[in-house]
Each structure stands twice: as structure tokens, then as C-alpha cells.
Regions:
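Hydrophobic structural segments
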Residues: 1-147
Length: 147
């Protein structure tokens, strides 16, 4: 698939224009024009970039991308290393913050709820962005293994 076609689809599917965010949503670093393999991660860290390259990915799709509102704008040190590594491999990096928080099927909250077997509340039941479950309040806190 062509990068421009995929970015257009993501822009529309995730309703990016509906969100006022702290960071840019969409393509943050342009790489190869053909996208055949995608790696997903929470953050565009050096470890995630290296894993995407090792996996033969053409796109690293992340929840926490780069260039946050209050972040320094200079490209030095860790930011330089990440950008350099991705550019040398032709790796595209796209980040979607609030759009992935809110999407009812593809979003982080929706996917976590699916894995946990939770059912979403009706849209009118909560003002919060994302997916909630009425049973969540009755569940003890802590971590567990699923799957």
C-alpha cells in the first residue's frame, strides 16, 4: 500500500481533525513510499524503532509520537539518534495520540476492553473519552495475565 493512501485512511478512520491535541497526529517522519509491514508501539522510542527495523517494517505506528507541545524543538541527543536511525532505514513514523484514545474499535481503550472481556457503556453513560465498563468499579485493583 502506498504511504499516502494509508495516511489518508488513518486520518479519516481515526477522525484526526476532531481532536485538539498536545502533539501532531499523523505522519511525523517520512520514509519509504511503499508500506508492506507495520509495527505498533506505545512510544517512538529507540528500542521500538530498532525493533521495527529488525522486523522489516516500513512504518512504526505509535500512540506517543514526537514533537509534543512543550517539548524542546532542537534535534539533539536522544531525539537525534531516534530520527537518524529511522531515516537511515527509510522507516516511516506516525503517531496518533487522542484519536487512538477515543476510537471505538481501533483505539487503545477499546482494544484493552476487548482483551479484558469488558462491554462498553452506552455513549450517554460517560462523558470521558474512551471505553468504560460498569463492572470496572467492582473489580479489585492490580495486574493480571490475560490470554
Amino acid at each position: 500500500m502506498q504511504r499516502t493512501e494509508l495516511m489518508t485512511w488513518l486520518q479519516q478512520e481515526l477522525a484526526v481533525d476532531m481532536f485538539k491535541d498536545y502533539a501532531p497526529n499523523g505522519l511525523q517522519l517520512q520514509g519509504k513510499s511503499d508500506i508492506g509491514h507495520i509495527t505498533c508501539a506505545v512510544t517512538a522510542s529507540l528500542a521500538a524503532i530498532e525493533a521495527a527495523i529488525e522486523n522489516g517494517s516500513d512504518l512504526l505506528l505509535v500512540h506517543h509520537g514526537w514533537f509534543w507541545k512543550s517539548e524542546p524543538t532542537v534535534i539533539t541527543d536522544w531525539k537525534f539518534k531516534r530520527i537518524q536511525t529511522a531515516m537511515q532505514a527509510g522507516l516511516n513514523i506516525a503517531g496518533y495520540h487522542l484519536p487512538l484514545d477515543a476510537h471505538p474499535q481501533l483505539g487503545n481503550n477499546a482494544q484493552l476492553a476487548r482483551v479484558l472481556g469488558l462491554k462498553p457503556l452506552p455513549a450517554k453513560a460517560t462523558a470521558a473519552v474512551g471505553v468504560a465498563d460498569a463492572a470496572a468499579a467492582a473489580q479489585p485493583p492490580g495486574f493480571g495475565r490475560f490470554g
